UniProtKB/Swiss-Prot annotation:
Tetramer of two alpha and two beta subunits. This is Phenylalanine--tRNA ligase alpha subunit. Its EC number is 6.1.1.20. Keywords: Aminoacyl-tRNA synthetase, ATP-binding, Cytoplasm, Ligase, Magnesium, Metal-binding, Nucleotide-binding, Protein biosynthesis. PANTHER family: PHENYLALANINE--TRNA LIGASE, MITOCHONDRIAL, PHENYLALANYL-TRNA SYNTHETASE. It catalyses: tRNA(Phe) + L-phenylalanine + ATP = L-phenylalanyl-tRNA(Phe) + AMP + diphosphate + H(+). GO terms for molecular function: ATP binding; magnesium ion binding; phenylalanine-tRNA ligase activity; tRNA binding. The lineage of its organism: Bacteria, Pseudomonadati, Pseudomonadota, Gammaproteobacteria, Enterobacterales. It holds the Pfam family Phe_tRNA-synt_N.
Length: 328
C-alpha cells in the first residue's frame, strides 16, 4: 500500500508551482482534506492486520507530517511575496492625496449624563455602588416592603426567569444589599440598568436609574430636600422652580414626587424620594430607633429628555448617528 503513496518530492513540485495562497489552500485540501488523498489511504488500513496497521499507519503519519511542513513553508514564502508586492505599490502612493474622513465618535448622551450625576454626588461625599442586574425577588421586592400581592410584581410589569429570579426593576436592590453589608453612616448612589415590561414613547424595557441613599443618626427630610434642590439646579444649569408633592412608595414613609416647572409652564415629574421606611431599615438589620435614612431615585432617560428637549425616549437606542452626534 505504501508503494502507492505519491513521492513527497513529486508533491513538493506541485506545491512549488502554486503562486497564490488560494491555490495552496486547494492543494492542501486535495491531499489532507477529509475526502483527500491521505484520507483514502487511511481508509484502507481498516482491512489490514493489527501489525500491518501499526507499520503502515506510522508511514502515513510521517508522510502527512512532511507534507504539512512543505505546505506551511511555501505559505510563508507566498506571504512574503505578497507583502513585497504591496510595498512596491505603496512606493508609488501619493501621500498628498486627501484621505477619507474618519468619523469621530461621541459619548452617548445617557453615558454622559450618568457621569455628570456621579461627579456631582462624589463631590458631596457619596460613594458609587454597582451590582446585580439579575436578582431574586427577596432583595428586589420583599426586603423593600413590596409584598407578594403588590401589582409591581405582576408578570406584565416584571421580567421573570422563574418563580424567584428576575431582571431587577429598580436599583434599590443594591441599596438593601449595601445596608445589610455595611454599618452606618452610609452615603451612596447606585447607577445602573433596570428592566420593566413596557415600551412606548416614554418607556423602554431597559432604562437607567441613579438611586441615592443616606443612613445616619438624625437624617431628616430637610437633608433630602436640600440635596435634591442642589442637584436639580446643577443639572439644569439654572434656577429651576421645584415643588415637592406627597406620594406613596412602599419602601419610604413620608414619600414625595419632585416636579420642575417646564418652559411650557407645566409641572413635570423628574424623580421620587422619601424617608426610608423603618421596616426596610429593620430588614437590613439597622435599628430604626437609632438611625434614620433618606433615599431618592432619578430616571436618567427622563431627565436627559427634559434637559435636551427630546420627546421620544426610544431615540436613545435606535443607533441613529444623526441624533447621537449632536451630543459632543
Amino acid at each position: 500500500m505504501c508503494d502507492a503513496l505519491k513521492s513527497i518530492k513529486k508533491i513538493k513540485k506541485e506545491i512549488q508551482r502554486t503562486t497564490t495562497v488560494e491555490e495552496l489552500k486547494t492543494l492542501r485540501i486535495k491531499y489532507l482534506g477529509k475526502k483527500g488523498y491521505l484520507a483514502s489511504k487511511m481508509q484502507k488500513l481498516f482491512s489490514l492486520s493489527l501489525d500491518k496497521k501499526k507499520i503502515y499507519g506510522s508511514i502515513i503519519n510521517k508522510f502527512k507530517s512532511d507534507l504539512n511542513i512543505e505546505l506551511d513553508l511555501h505559505k510563508k514564502i507566498l506571504d512574503m511575496i505578497a507583502v513585497s508586492s504591496l510595498n512596491k505599490k505603496e512606493k508609488n502612493f501619493d501621500v498628498s492625496l486627501i484621505s477619507r474622513k474618519n468619523d469621530i465618535g461621541t459619548i452617548h448622551p445617557i453615558t454622559y449624563v450618568i457621569s455628570s450625576i456621579e461627579n456631582f454626588f462624589l463631590k458631596l461625599g457619596f460613594s458609587v455602588i454597582t451590582g446585580f442586574e439579575i436578582d431574586d425577588d427577596y432583595h428586589n421586592f420583599d426586603l423593600l416592603n413590596i409584598p407578594k400581592y403588590h401589582p409591581a410584581r405582576a408578570d406584565h410589569d416584571t421580567f421573570w426567569f422563574d418563580a424567584n429570579r428576575l431582571l431587577r426593576t429598580q436599583t434599590s436592590n443594591m441599596q438593601i444589599r449595601t445596608m445589610k453589608n455595611e454599618t452606618p453612616p452610609i452615603k451612596i448612589i447606585v447607577p445602573g440598568k433596570v428592566y420593566r415590561n413596557d415600551y412606548d414613547a416614554t418607556h423602554t424595557p431597559m432604562f437607567h436609574q441613579v438611586e441615592g441613599l443616606i443612613v445616619d443618626h438624625d437624617v431628616n427630610f430637610f437633608h433630602l430636600k436640600w440635596i435634591i434642590e442642589m442637584f436639580l439646579k446643577f443639572f439644569f444649569n439654572k434656577t429651576v422652580k421645584i415643588r415637592f408633592k406627597s406620594s406613596y412608595f412602599p419602601f419610604t414613609v413620608l414619600s414625595a414626587e419632585v416636579d420642575i416647572l417646564g418652559n411650557n409652564k407645566k409641572w413635570l415629574e423628574v424623580l421620587g424620594c422619601g424617608m426610608i421606611h423603618p421596616k426596610v431599615l429593620s430588614n437590613a438589620n439597622i435599628n430604626p430607633k437609632m438611625y434614620s435614612g433618606c433615599a431618592f431615585g432619578i430616571g436618567v432617560e427622563r431627565i436627559t429628555m427634559l434637559r435636551y428637549g427630546i420627546s421620544d425616549i426610544r431615540v436613545f437606542y435606535e443607533n441613529n448617528l444623526k441624533f447621537l452626534t449632536q451630543f459632543k
